[in-house]
Amino acid sequence: MKLLEKMIYVEFLMIIMVIWVVPMSYGHGAMIGNAVEAPDVAEAPGINDPSKALDTNWYDARATFYGDIHGGDTQQGACGYGNLFRQGYGLATAALSTALFNDGYTCGACYEIMCTRDPQWCLPGSVKITATNFCPANYSKTTDLWCNPPQKHFDLSLAMFLKIAKYKAGVVPVRYRRIPCSKTGGVKFETKGNPYFLMVLIYNVGGAGDIKYVQVKGNKTGWITMKKNWGQNWTTITVLTGQGLSFRVTTSDGITKDFWNVMPKNWGFGQTFDGRINF
């Protein structure tokens, strides 16, 4: 009887070990039969979150202009875009005051702006622009504090200003709202930095336009969270040279898209790659 009890006890232990050990042997993310592979990292915050839908309500602000009629002085800027003509933004751009710029997270957002409540200087119609620069506060001034907090202000390119107001107005009251960005072609990824500090400028982003979260994946790595450096330049110190790269991008409205195999294994610095799809 004791022998039978021992045999039953041993079989019971073996069953427990099989239940406990076998799943562990597959490791994190392994596939069992037709099971779906677990993700490399936790989902990005706000992914496809309908509560973060674009706020398209109209708000009050002011607008001025900077640069010349050809866009002089509007190129480069605090969003990191560089040559706005080459990158597809052209003259339909504006620098935002501190209250709107949001430490660069608003770079790439699109707005519709119209001149209001000043019939002497306002022109009918509206303009649609992309945020590409920052209008810094000037705390030494006591008047004309257009870009100082908490003022909401758009410093438009001259070409855009002249579509909604007369030149001599200088500054006009406006109404503005966020609108979806309509861009041609795929999202663009421009490489900068060095092997130990990869920086990627992401531009030509449709939909909400402004990016809140970025991950990169080499063909030998999982998803790696990138840090916002300045404007829409995103960085990682993980060495990824020699690997093909994919990107996961989340815009401010919570929508996320995966851009697979954007860069081949032999990518280099100072190159621009087309993500082929857009928001």
UniProtKB/Swiss-Prot annotation:
Superkingdom, taxonomy of origin: Eukaryota
Annotated InterPro entries: Expan_Lol_pI, Expansin, Expansin/allergen_DPBB_dom, Expansin_CBD, Expansin_CBD_sf, RlpA-like_DPBB, RlpA-like_sf
Bilayer disposition of the protein: Peripheral membrane protein
Residue ranges of domain Expansin-like EG45 in the record: 76-186
Biological process terms in GO annotation: anatomical structure morphogenesis; plant-type cell wall loosening
Primary localization class, coarse: secreted
Family the entry assigns: Belongs to the expansin family. Expansin A subfamily.
Pfam families given in the database record: DPBB_1, Expansin_C
Keywords for this protein: Cell wall, Cell wall biogenesis/degradation, Membrane, Secreted, Signal
Signal sequence extent: 1-27
Compartment(s) where it occurs, according to its Swiss-Prot or TrEMBL record: Secreted, Cell wall; Membrane
Expansin-like CBD domain span: 196-275
Stated role: Causes loosening and extension of plant cell walls by disrupting non-covalent bonding between cellulose microfibrils and matrix glucans. No enzymatic activity has been found.
One cellular component (GO) term of this entry: membrane
Protein name, UniProt field: Expansin-A22
